Amino acid sequence: MIYDKIQYIVALISEFARHYNLNDVQVARYMSRYGALDLCDSEYEVMHTQSFNDMVKAVAEYCKHNGGLL
């Protein structure tokens, strides 16, 4: 289960990076700074059943709500 969660978060970071034309390190730092990595960890069971496109949008909104500027 932990391996699946890690794979999912890595894939989500990659999709987020592609969507916003950033690199994976920038996105990982951004998501960490605004609490999205913790969100992905705690809400994995729901998030992994949704499309990456929807989750990129949801994570972006979550980060924005917490002070992110993307």
Predicted regions and their residues:
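Serine/threonine-rich low-complexity intrinsically disordered regions
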Residues: 2-4, 40, 49
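N-terminal acidic leader/helix
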Residues: 1-26
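Generic alpha-helical secondary structure signal
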Residues: 7, 25, 34, 50-53, ...
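Amphipathic, hydrophobic secondary-structure cores in small proteins
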Residues: 17, 23-47
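Generic structural signal for hydrophobic core residues of well-folded globular domains
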Residues: 16, 20, 31, 59, ...
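Long, compositionally biased
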Residues: 44-70
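Mixed-charge, low-complexity intrinsically disordered regions
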Residues: 5, 19, 38, 67-70
